[in-house]
Structure formats: structure tokens, C-alpha cells
Amino acid sequence: MAKPAARPRKKIKKTVVDGIAHIHASFNNTIVTITDRQGNALSWATSGGSGFRGSRKSTPFAAQIAAERAGQAALEYGLKNLDVNVKGPGPGRESAVRALNSCGYKIASITDVTPIPHNGCRPPKKRRV
């Protein structure tokens, strides 16, 4: 006998007050992920996913747009306070933090979590233009 069709349950949005914004700024792209305190992703955005391709992905303006998109999406969860972790040497570091600040978040701390090798892998060769 056929089972009756299960009614789709409404997805319950959890409310999160404190979160962490992880900004990964590489030379080619900027990735902004906003998580709760446990590390569960609430929203994310990238420069490439925001409509920038090629060398325009690595600009501070592209990082600003990506941070604004991730910040606006995370506002639906009731997020108010952010700790910011910045990783990488890219050009979008400061502009992404400024964009999150302009979204209305109260930024409690900014931490640089760029991994520094203890003489690990050989770095890429210098460019000759």
C-alpha cells in the first residue's frame, strides 16, 4: 500500500548572535566565509563568484563585494558580533574587513592567521616580466 505523501517540513532558521568571519586572501582570489562559534558555515562568497573573472578577481574592490555578499546573507541569522580571521597575503585583506564593518557588524577582534612556514616548501620562483 502506498504511503501518504509526507508534508515538507519548514526549515527552522537558527539564530546566531556571535560569529567568525574567515577571510582567505590569496594573490588570485578572495574567499569570505562566515561561521558560528563552532565553525558551521552560515554564508560564504568569493570574488570569482561575485562576477569578477581573470585578473579582476584579485582586486580589493572584488574582495569588498564578496565580503558584502557574505555579510548580507549572514544577517538573516541574526548575527551581530564578528571576530575576523584574515589569512593570506592577497590585496583584498583590508577592504574585506572594511566591507564587513560597513554591513553593520560589531567587529570584536581582527586576527592574522596566515600560516608561516618554518622553512617548509620551496617558494615559487620570482617573476621575470
From Swiss-Prot:
GO terms for biological process: translation. GO terms for molecular function: rRNA binding; structural constituent of ribosome. GO terms for cellular component: ribonucleoprotein complex; ribosome. Keywords: Ribonucleoprotein, Ribosomal protein, RNA-binding, rRNA-binding. Belongs to the universal ribosomal protein uS11 family. InterPro entries: Ribosomal_uS11 (IPR001971), Ribosomal_uS11_bac-type (IPR019981), Ribosomal_uS11_CS (IPR018102), Ribosomal_uS11_sf (IPR036967). Pfam families: Ribosomal_S11. Part of the 30S ribosomal subunit. Interacts with proteins S7 and S18. Binds to IF-3. Located on the platform of the 30S subunit, it bridges several disparate RNA helices of the 16S rRNA. Forms part of the Shine-Dalgarno cleft in the 70S ribosome. The keyword rRNA-binding applies. It comes from Pseudomonas putida (strain GB-1). This is Small ribosomal subunit protein uS11. Coiled coil: none annotated. PROSITE patterns: RIBOSOMAL_S11.
